[in-house]
């Protein structure tokens, strides 16, 4: 039996703490997988994956990003990262978790999995700290047009002049998710997440999944995404690091696979060589709770084991 340990760890932002978990397998720890979750969700949603992988000897750990899940002081913190540089704070917290976990399990192969917003942070992480990893899984990612992201970032800055960084703009939120539910209208606004309607309803019933990002968080996220358009930044990624891209071919975040392929090409253009990709037919955005989630779990476990040799 695996051991699920809930933790509270310090953020790199003074005065802030992060909710985290560590799922420890029984017996030998063959590898560690650190998680970077998505926007407007929380890390405990990943516990079923963690328990599955622990059954294969893989320790899984992760924390709620600032402004998410249990990493809030009050509900006013939902969707707020940090000032003056929220993007840097999120990355620094991810790296602090890596350092903390490696101290507990020295010499054990170490991997990172990022989903959705967490995949954009994982891609930044690979450029800054990829030399500390043995591989990474990039899930539910995309490749947004640079001009659009720059416009959105500038808009956040302008709005913040008038409203402050903790303001929640419906316009920015609607722009960020524009068109995602196209063709699925009529039941909920979030059926693009998943073919499993019960999981969509569960998501919408949880206050940890229904808040609106502040201008601070949007600005921070857009700042990070823009870095992924910089060839000099991407060139810092270790060229031979094993990468696995996973996405549904009906996921609007990845433009039904087109955005995923563009993200991969941007890395290949930077000289990154060891990239695999799997698109799941009919699957939408949240692969870990999709109707084929067991297949996804098994693919993740098999890929990790393949890179332990």
Map each language-model feature to its residues.
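Short beta-strand/loop motif that positions the catalytic acidic residue
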Residues: 245-247
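Catalytic active-site module of serine/aspartate enzymes centered on a nucleophile-bearing elbow/loop
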Residues: 270-309
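Alpha/beta-hydrolase fold nucleophile elbow
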Residues: 105-116
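N-terminal cap/lid segment of alpha/beta-hydrolase-fold proteins
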Residues: 1-27
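Active-site glycine-rich loops that stabilize anionic/oxyanionic intermediates
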Residues: 36-41, 116-117, 249-250
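Conserved alpha/beta-hydrolase
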Residues: 48-76
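Alpha/beta-hydrolase active-site loop
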Residues: 82-102
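Alpha/beta-hydrolase-fold enzymes
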Residues: 122-208
